């Protein structure tokens, strides 16, 4: 009979397998400690929303982002203003997330939610491409993101994003929000200024317009939204997605575009 002294067993050094297993575990889906309520927003309103309580904390979001498909590819146009309620936090926020060299995503809603989950999507897309030795399709990438956010439905995520790119089926554009909604389409606009942007976009859209006309349409649509929407502004960034990937076209300050698009006439100018 063999007697083993378990109290004096020496700790072995971690092997290469243990190290790799630890790395793989680290790369798995991020896990968060969720609140013990099915819907934290409803719980807070039911618990604290009564006449004697101070005004409840309101998470107000504002932005203008749009994307559309035309004959020459896909145009993505966004503003760069970030607000915290009535306070302007920044005028130089990057609202286009460069997921992969062939995929772009936009952010509207909570900046942290959009940025974190779209970067997580980029990690998963790169792993897919390494394992399968082919580019991931836009449909698959958008489905991955929709499945991720759906698992957190009701837990306070705030996200409205457009996933766009060019794959084997051609230019593709999808809309995904924090409820797991996933829509495929040709033209989308998201954010508090989207109503104004849609008006300009739908009026000026032509499938066979050239690239410069498409850039100008995306720029004008977001600009007019920033002119009327208090929560949009800063610079207007325009991207062009083509078969060989995406490229950034321009970044124009809204104040300079105001001088370009509006012919300001003095009030006291005599009539002709």
From Swiss-Prot:
Cysteine pairings via disulfide bonds: none
GO cellular component: cytoplasm; cytosol; nucleus; proteasome core complex, beta-subunit complex
Prodomain positions: 1-62
Ribosomal protein is among the record's keywords: no
Broad class of where this protein is predominantly found: cytoplasm
Keywords from the UniProt entry: Cytoplasm, Hydrolase, Nucleus, Protease, Proteasome, Threonine protease, Zymogen
EC top class, as a word: hydrolase
GO MF entries: endopeptidase activity; threonine-type endopeptidase activity
Subcellular location: Cytoplasm; Nucleus
InterPro entries with a match to the protein in the record: Ntn_hydrolases_N, Pept_T1A_subB, Proteasome_sua/b, Proteasome_suB-type
Source organism superkingdom: Eukaryota
Stored SUPFAM superfamilies: N-terminal nucleophile aminohydrolases (Ntn hydrolases)
Enzyme Commission number, as recorded: 3.4.25.1
Family: Belongs to the peptidase T1B family.
Quaternary data: The 26S proteasome consists of a 20S proteasome core and two 19S regulatory subunits. The 20S proteasome core is composed of 28 subunits that are arranged in four stacked rings, resulting in a barrel-shaped structure. The two end rings are each formed by seven alpha subunits, and the two central rings are each formed by seven beta subunits. The catalytic chamber with the active sites is on the inside of the barrel.
Protein name, as recorded: Proteasome subunit beta type-5
Species name: Dictyostelium discoideum
Gene name in the database record: psmB5
């Amino acid at each position: 009979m063999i007697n083993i002294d378990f109290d004096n067993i020496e700790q072995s050094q971690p092997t290469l397998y243990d190290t790799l297993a630890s790395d793989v575990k680290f790369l798995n889906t991020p896990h968060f400690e969720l609140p013990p309520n099915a819907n934290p927003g409803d719980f807070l309103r039911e618990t604290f929303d009564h006449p004697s309580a101070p005004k409840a904390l309101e998470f107000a979001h504002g932005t203008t982002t749009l994307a559309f498909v035309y004959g020459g590819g896909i145009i993505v146009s966004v503003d760069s203003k970030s607000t915290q309620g009535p306070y302007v936090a920044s005028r130089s926020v990057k609202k286009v997330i460069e997921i992969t060299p062939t995929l772009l995503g936009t952010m509207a809603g909570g900046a942290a939610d959009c940025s974190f989950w779209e970067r997580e999507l980029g990690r998963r897309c790169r792993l897919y491409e390494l394992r399968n030795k082919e580019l991931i399709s836009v449909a698959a990438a958008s489905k991955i993101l929709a499945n991720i956010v759906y698992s957190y439905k009701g837990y306070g995520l705030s996200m409205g994003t457009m996933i766009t790119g060019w794959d084997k089926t051609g230019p593709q554009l999808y809309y995904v929000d924090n409820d797991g909604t996933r829509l495929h389409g040709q033209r989308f606009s998201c954010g508090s200024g989207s109503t104004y942007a849609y008006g300009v976009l739908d009026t000026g859209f032509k499938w066979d317009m050239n690239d410069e006309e498409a850039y100008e349409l995306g720029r004008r649509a977001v600009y007019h939204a920033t002119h009327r929407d208090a929560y949009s502004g800063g610079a207007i960034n325009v991207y062009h997605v083509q078969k060989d990937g995406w490229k950034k076209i321009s970044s124009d300050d809204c104040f300079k575009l105001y001088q370009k698009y509006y012919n300001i006439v003095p009030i006291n100018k005599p009539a002709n």
